[in-house]
Amino acid sequence: MANDYTALGSAIYSLLSGAATVSIYNQRAPQGGTPPYGIFNRQSAIDERTFNTAGISSDYVLKAVSNRVWPGEAKEVYQGLHSIMQDGALSVSGFVLLRNQRGSTFEYQDADGFWHVGGLYRIEIEES
């Protein structure tokens, strides 16, 4: 499963950036980036093996970030991102997508006043 996490991250970026109305970043936005924007990152992952196949079960965070006083903008942007991501057809070279679904959501305001609204997505792929 060489380079499988890189391929999965690239597939998520391609899916989101191809349809989103805001900038999309992996891990974190660049300093000075203009909100609102979307950020995704791998939270955790495990390798799964059966008798003759291998795959990955991973959890990815997807969130919208806004610098508005209230969370409305972040909620609206996240709803758009969620509609793209939920059951989105990720194309991962050498793998078959088994599942791409949200399991939970979150909302908070950080110490700098930025709103973070998002969800945790379970993505499962297996070698083709």
Label every PLM stretch briefly.
Residues 34-44:
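A short, hydrophobic beta-strand-centered structural micro-motif
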